[in-house]
């Protein structure tokens, strides 16, 4: 996915311009500038963030074999990083999704049948990642958006943790199995035609002007890092899956 030098340079410029935000340093302490100059700088930073995100979307169109990550979180009982429970003898793994939808709020502790696909990451991967930063609320939200491959000011307000049976999860890549630590760029021979259609349709609709940097490699595109594009391991909960809502927590409380 890495683009040519000029695109990489633009990304570096974006990150340099955004360093004041990312390291949580007040602009007033960083620059000797008038209020008008500071406002102009803020507008420039916001513009550059949008450009950086769009470059990530364009970059993600081309998924290459050298970008395969061999350390994805596998959804297996022997993965001690995961959190499990058993209900009626069936194992369920704790997953989390970032959302602004209020439909989960009154379902805590209850079972719920999903009427849409829900994109999730395994608990506690996201919390472990964000704990290395000391950011104020605005910068923390931005870093989460970057890590999860979402556009800036995306409007997510809460994290919803849910218990999910592994059979209801798949990786959003040509190789949907969840029990290994990497994704193949090719469809396995046993993948159903309907799933191939799902992937191909997502490819056609994911990379436009208002698109998302879907890697198709089992991880989110971290467009805020200068060292790696690899974000969180991502999984989709199937439509019709019955899950148990564990908690609904606002963004700042969840990650602090």
Residue ranges and their predicted role:
Residues 124-141:
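Short active-site loop/helix that positions an aromatic residue
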Residues 99-100, 119-125, 148, 163-168:
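Short, flexible loop/turn elements at secondary-structure junctions
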Residues 27-32:
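Sec/Tat signal peptide C-region and signal peptidase I cleavage site
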Residues 92, 101-104, 125-128, 169-171:
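Primarily extracytoplasmic ectodomains and periplasmic/lumenal surface modules that are beta-strand-rich
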Residues 145-256:
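Conserved NAD+-utilizing ADP-ribose enzyme module
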Residues 1-9:
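N-terminal secretory signal peptides that target proteins for export/translocation
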Residues 13-24:
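Bacterial N-terminal signal peptides
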Residues 33-119:
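ADP-ribose/NAD+-binding catalytic cleft of ART/PARP-like enzymes
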């Amino acid at each position: 996915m890495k683009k040519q030098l000029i695109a990489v340079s633009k990304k570096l410029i974006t990150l340099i311009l955004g360093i004041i935000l990312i390291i949580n340093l007040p602009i007033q302490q960083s620059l000797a500038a008038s209020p008008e100059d500071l406002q102009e700088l803020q507008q420039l930073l916001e513009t550059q963030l949008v450009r950086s995100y769009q470059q990530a979307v364009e970059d993600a169109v081309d998924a290459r074999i050298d970008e395969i990550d061999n350390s994805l979180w596998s959804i297996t009982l022997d993965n001690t990083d995961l959190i499990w429970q058993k209900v009626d003898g069936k194992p369920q793994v704790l997953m989390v999704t970032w959302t602004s939808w209020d439909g989960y709020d009154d379902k805590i502790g209850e079972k719920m049948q999903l009427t849409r696909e829900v994109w999730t990451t395994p608990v506690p991967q996201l919390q472990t990642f964000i704990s290395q930063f000391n950011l104020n609320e605005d910068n923390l939200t931005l870093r989460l958006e970057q890590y999860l491959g979402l556009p800036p000011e995306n409007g997510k307000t809460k994290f919803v943790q849910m218990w999910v049976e592994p059979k209801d999860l798949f990786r959003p890549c040509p190789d949907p199995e969840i029990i290994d630590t990497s994704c193949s760029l090719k469809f396995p021979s046993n993948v159903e035609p309907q799933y191939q259609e799902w992937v191909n349709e997502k490819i056609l609709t994911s990379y436009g002007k208002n698109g998302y940097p879907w890697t198709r490699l089992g991880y989110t595109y971290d467009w805020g890092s200068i060292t790696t594009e690899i974000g969180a391991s991502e999984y989709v909960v199937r439509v019709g899956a019955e899950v148990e809502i564990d908690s609904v927590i606002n963004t700042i409380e969840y990650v602090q």
